[in-house]
C-alpha cells in the first residue's frame, strides 16, 4: 500500500484572501448579551459535551519558541467568521453561534502569498504590538511565506504569480523575500514563527514524474534556501514545510524527505558562507490529519505515520542523522471526522471536518513544539471536494459552519475566560 502513495497529490494551501478591517465587527459585541442570557438559562450548558482528559505537557524544552508566548490572533480571519456567526443566529442556532464567537479568539497564521500581500505583515505587526502592550503578554506571530515561482506544481489549485521562465526567481528574491525579511527583522519586540513554502519540497520527494515539478527542483531548493539565509534573526523561528504523514510518512519516503531537507540547508549554508539555523518543520499544513488519532483509519494500515504525532516521531531520527533539528509544529486548524475520507489522498475541502484542538504547547510528544492553526479554516482549498466550493482562498461560509459544528471542545470549553 505504501507504494500507492509515492505520487500522492498534496493538500494545496489556498491563497490568502483580500485584507479586511482589523477590528472585529460590532455585531459580535451587540449579540454577546444574547448568548450569555442563553447560557444562563441552560440553553448552552446542556449542549456542551464533557471535555476530554487534558493531555500531559511534554518535558520542558527551554528553546521551544512557543513556551510562555501568546499566539497571535489574526483579526482578518476572525472578521470573516462574523458571517458564520450571523448565519447561525439567522437559523436560531444559539449553541453554534456561541461556538463561533469562541473560534474567533483562536490564533491563526497570516498567509503572505503574493507581492501585493506583503502589507499583511505590517498589519499583523501593528496589531500584535497593540495586543502585547495592552496585555503585557509576549506575542508570537505566525506567518506563512508562500510565493515560489512555479508554485503548486502538482495540484495547480494554488498556482502563484511568479514563473521561473519570466524572471520569477529574481523577482522572488528581490521583490518578495527581501521586503518580507526586512519587515520581520525590524520588529524585534515580537517573536515570529514562519512556515516556509508549503508543499514545495514534498513535491520534490514524490512528484518528479510531473514535468512542472521536475523543472522546478533548483528553483524550489534555492528559493527556500535563500529565504532561510534572509531570516536569520534571533526573534525569528523558521519551520520548513514537511507535508504530512500520508504523504512523506511512508517508510520509503522518510529518508528521502530528510535528504531533501538537508540539501536545502546545505545550499543555504553554501550561499551565505555560514551556518544557518531553522527551528524545525511544519506538518499537516492545509491538510486534515489529526495530531493524535482517536480512531485509526483503514487507509493508514500499512503506515507507521498514521497520525501526525506518529509522523513526527517517525521522521525525527532521520532528521537527527543528518544533523537537522527534530522539532515540529502541527497544523490542526481543520481535522477530518473519523470516516470522512475513503483515501488518504483526499485533501480538498474534506467534510465532515471540524476545527481541531486549540493551539497549545501541550502536545503529548516531546518533538512537537506546538499545536497551531496554520490554514485559516473556512477559506476554500479550491473548486473541488465539496459541492459549490469556491476558488482557493475564497471564503466558504457553508464549510465554515460545519467546522464550527464539529469543533474540538478545547475551542470553546474555556468560554468564561473571554467575558
Swiss-Prot record:
Swiss-Prot/TrEMBL keywords? Carbohydrate metabolism, Cellulose degradation, Glycoprotein, Glycosidase, Hydrolase, Polysaccharide degradation, Secreted, Signal
Q: Sorted alphabetically, which InterPro entries does this protein's record hold?
A: Beta_cellobiohydrolase (IPR016288), Beta_cellobiohydrolase_sf (IPR036434), Glyco_hydro_6_CS (IPR001524)
Record has Glycoprotein as a keyword: yes
- Gene Ontology, cellular component aspect: extracellular region
Signal peptide feature range: 1-47
The EC number of this protein is 3.2.1.91
Q: Which reaction does it catalyse?
A: Hydrolysis of (1->4)-beta-D-glucosidic linkages in cellulose and cellotetraose, releasing cellobiose from the non-reducing ends of the chains
The SS bond pairs are none
What's this protein's name?
Answer: 1,4-beta-D-glucan cellobiohydrolase CEL6B
Give the source species.
Podospora anserina (strain S / ATCC MYA-4624 / DSM 980 / FGSC 10383)
Amino acid at each position: 500500500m505504501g507504494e500507492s502513495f509515492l505520487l500522492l497529490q498534496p493538500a494545496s494551501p489556498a491563497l490568502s484572501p483580500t485584507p479586511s478591517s482589523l477590528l472585529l465587527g460590532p455585531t459580535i459585541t451587540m449579540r454577546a448579551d444574547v448568548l450569555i442570557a442563553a447560557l444562563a438559562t441552560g440553553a448552552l450548558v446542556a449542549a456542551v459535551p464533557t471535555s476530554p482528559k487534558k493531555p500531559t505537557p511534554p518535558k520542558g524544552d527551554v528553546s521551544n519558541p512557543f513556551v510562555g508566548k501568546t499566539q497571535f490572533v489574526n483579526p482578518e480571519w476572525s472578521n470573516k467568521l462574523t458571517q458564520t456567526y450571523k448565519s447561525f443566529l439567522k437559523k436560531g442556532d444559539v449553541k453554534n453561534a456561541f461556538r463561533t464567537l469562541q473560534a474567533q479568539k483562536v490564533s491563526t497564521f497570516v498567509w503572505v502569498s503574493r507581492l501585493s500581500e506583503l502589507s499583511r505583515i505590517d498589519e499583523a505587526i501593528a496589531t500584535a504590538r497593540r495586543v502585547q502592550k495592552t496585555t503585557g503578554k509576549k506575542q508570537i506571530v505566525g506567518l506563512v511565506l508562500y510565493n515560489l515561482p512555479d508554485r503548486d506544481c502538482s495540484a495547480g489549485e494554488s498556482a502563484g504569480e511568479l514563473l521561473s521562465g519570466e524572471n520569477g526567481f529574481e523577482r522572488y528574491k528581490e521583490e518578495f523575500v527581501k521586503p518580507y525579511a526586512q519587515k520581520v527583522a525590524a520588529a524585534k519586540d515580537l517573536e515570529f514563527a514562519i512556515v516556509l513554502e508549503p508543499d514545495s519540497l514534498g513535491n520534490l520527494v514524490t512528484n518528479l514524474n510531473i514535468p512542472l515539478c521536475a523543472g522546478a527542483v533548483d528553483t524550489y531548493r534555492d528559493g527556500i534556501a535563500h529565504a532561510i539565509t534572509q531570516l536569520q534573526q534571533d526573534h525569528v523561528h523558521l519551520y520548513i514545510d514537511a507535508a504530512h504523514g500520508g504523504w512523506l510518512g511512508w517508510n520509503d519516503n522518510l529518508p528521502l524527505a530528510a535528504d531533501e531537507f538537508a540539501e536545502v540547508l546545505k545550499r543555504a549554508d553554501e550561499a551565505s558562507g555560514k551556518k544557518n539555523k531553522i527551528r524545525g518543520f511544519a506538518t499537516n499544513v492545509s491538510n486534515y490529519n489529526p495530531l493524535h488519532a482517536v480512531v485509526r483509519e483503514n487507509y493508514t494500515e500499512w503506515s507507521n505515520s498514521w497520525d501526525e504525532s506518529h509522523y513526527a516521531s517517525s521522521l525525527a531520527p532521520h532528521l537527527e542523522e543528518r544533523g537537522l533539528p527534530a522539532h515540529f509544529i502541527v497544523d490542526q486548524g481543520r481535522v477530518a471526522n473519523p470516516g470522512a475520507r475513503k483515501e488518504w489522498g483526499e485533501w480538498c475541502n474534506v467534510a465532515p471536518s471540524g476545527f481541531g484542538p486549540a493551539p497549545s504547547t501541550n502536545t503529548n510528544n516531546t518533538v512537537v513544539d506546538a499545536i497551531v492553526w496554520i490554514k485559516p479554516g473556512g477559506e476554500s482549498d479550491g473548486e473541488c471536494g465539496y459541492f459549490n466550493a469556491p476558488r482557493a482562498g475564497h471564503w466558504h461560509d457553508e464549510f465554515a459552519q460545519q467546522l464550527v459544528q464539529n469543533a474540538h471542545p478545547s475551542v470553546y470549553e474555556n468560554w468564561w475566560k473571554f467575558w
